[in-house]
UniProtKB/Swiss-Prot annotation:
Cited Pfam families: Ribosomal_S11 (PF00411)
Any one GO BP annotation for this protein: translation
Classification via InterPro entries: Ribosomal_uS11, Ribosomal_uS11_archaeal, Ribosomal_uS11_CS, Ribosomal_uS11_sf
Subunit structure comment from the entry: Part of the 30S ribosomal subunit.
Protein name in UniProt: Small ribosomal subunit protein uS11
PROSITE patterns: RIBOSOMAL_S11
Family: Belongs to the universal ribosomal protein uS11 family.
Gene symbol of the encoding locus: rps11
GO cellular component: ribonucleoprotein complex; ribosome
Entry's Gene Ontology molecular function annotations: rRNA binding; structural constituent of ribosome
Function: Located on the platform of the 30S subunit.
């Protein structure tokens, strides 16, 4: 076998980051950091990419913000991310907003490898009193 026929398997060096996705019903924030979370690599929000305030939390805004964050991260050498999804939590809503799923899908389609996806919504262990009064919100 000649040297030309031997293929050298050069393994591409993988550099991982963490994509923190905060999805509320008012906005979606995509924040890509290094693995420790100490250094910000890219940060985009739904409000940065759309004009109307009502569209900040939409899946479309989340998709564009995630795509731009992924492009910026890939320029800086990140080629895989672990995803941490967070809703407002605490005494507020514990469900992620409409942009969370769209943001995850956009990160994957932008060419980033997806590692773990985990929910890091803060859950109270009997913390502060929820708003609405003793009898709750009467609709």
């Amino acid at each position: 076998m000649s040297e030309e026929q031997q293929t050298v398997n050069i393994k591409k060096k993988e550099k991982w980051g963490v994509a923190h996705i905060y999805a509320s019903y008012n906005n979606t924030i995509i924040h890509i950091t290094d693995l420790t979370g100490a250094e910000t690599i890219s940060k985009w929000s739904g409000g940065m990419v759309v004009k109307a305030d009502r569209d900040e939390s939409s899946p479309y805004a989340a998709m564009i913000a995630a795509r731009r964050a992924a492009e910026e991260a890939m320029e800086k050498g990140i080629n895989g991310v672990h995803i941490k999804v967070r809703a407002p939590g605490g005494s507020k809503s514990k469900n992620p907003g409409p942009g969370a799923q769209a943001a995850i899908r956009a990160l994957a389609r932008a060419g980033l490898r997806i590692g773990r996806v985990e929910d890091v919504t803060p859950i109270p262990h009997d913390g502060t009193r929820p708003k609405g009064g003793r009898r709750g919100r009467r609709v």
